[in-house]
Design a protein with these regions (language model features):
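PRPP-associated nucleotide enzymes
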Residues: 1-326
């Protein structure tokens, strides 16, 4: 025999950190596979240890970890998992970060500040990641920080289709909470039949995080059902002020729609006490039972992530998942 033929069969493996294993289980279920068994625990001093219980040699590995609080711990655990996979000879390693930590630190607002979103990308690459898969980055330019392919998925169709099924589209106005997300609002409008778009002019002090001053509403919202859209809800200050501003301008109803439910600090109380009739989010982050309330709707992001993983594994196309029109 003059040649040795190797098996060309590819092996897809899903791995999960401890931040949100329920999401990873849902993704694996959509793919019809199980999660690779992993041992992970903290030493007494807080250091993280990870070991995979099965061979990963030659596998196409997808490491799912949402960067929920405590953010730094979840990121470090994912980095350690990537390093372990690299040293165990995984063929390709894809970081799946449904919520990408430090995404708001994507540029320097003033001198002597870091660009932490870039540092994150460098850390993943150094650890051994070949590819990055994320959902609704705070700003799209973060894709350029990673030296390799980036699959930037959009939850917009999922959110828009849900909202569109609940309201009279002829009475709908899509509202951006600031001028920076008007383009996203326009894409919502396209998906929902060309409904009007408005935005709220606001100012923010770069020295005071999580605080903004809501200004005037730009656009006609009188008698309309308004959908305030954003990529995340952190302390909910911006978005609840937007709700108040819309009602002050004569809006008939307001729905809040956002991808990432960070829900820090006073967020739950603010949302519970807001005049919005419904808050719609995706499960890119875990939402504890105590943070759930009447009027909160949580949509599953697992089918979108599973579809993207399948396309990447099978060398298919994920373009429709990038452009937000899937």
């Amino acid at each position: 025999m003059s040649e040795l033929r190797l098996s060309s069969e590819k092996r897809l493996r899903i791995f999960t950190g401890r931040a949100f294993p329920e999401l990873a289980e849902s993704v694996a279920s959509e793919l019809g596979i199980t999660i690779t068994p992993t041992s992970a625990y903290d030493f007494a001093n807080g250091e993280i240890f990870v070991r995979f219980e099965e061979s990963v040699r030659g596998s196409d590995a997808f490491v799912i970890q949402s960067h929920a609080a405590p953010v730094n711990k979840q990121i470090m655990e994912q980095l350690i998992m990537i390093d372990a996979l690299k040293r165990a000879s995984a063929k390709r390693i894809t970081v799946v970060a449904p919520f990408y930590g430090y995404a708001r630190q994507d540029k320097k607002h003033r001198g002597r500040e870091p660009i932490s979103a870039r540092l994150m990308a460098d850390l993943f690459k150094t650890a051994g990641a070949d590819r990055l898969m994320v959902v609704d980055l705070h700003t799209s330019q973060i894709q350029g920080f990673f030296d390799g392919p980036v699959d930037h998925l959009f939850a917009l169709p999922l959110l828009a289709n849900y909202v569109g099924s609940k309201v009279d589209r002829s009475q709908l106005t899509i509202v951006s909470p600031d001028s920076g997300r008007v383009r996203v609002a326009e894409r919502w409008s396209d998906l929902l039949g060309g409904c009007p778009v408005a935005f709220i002019h606001k100012t923010r002090d770069p020295l005071v995080p999580n605080e903004s001053t809501t200004g005037r509403v730009v656009g006609d919202v009188q008698g309309k059902t308004c959908v305030v859209i954003d990529d995340m809800i952190d302390t909910a200050g911006t978005i609840t002020k937007a709700v108040d501003a819309l009602f002050n301008e004569g809006a008939k109803d307001v729905i809040i729609a956002a991808t990432h439910a960070v829900f820090s600090g006073p967020a739950i109380d603010r949302l519970k006490n807001s005049r919005a009739s419904e808050v719609v989010v995706c499960d890119t982050l875990p939402i504890p039972v105590e943070n759930r309330f009447d009027g909160l709707t949580v949509l599953s992001i697992a089918p979108l992530i599973a579809r993207a993983i399948r396309e990447v594994f099978e060398d298919g196309s994920v373009t429709s998942l990038f452009d937000g029109h899937s």
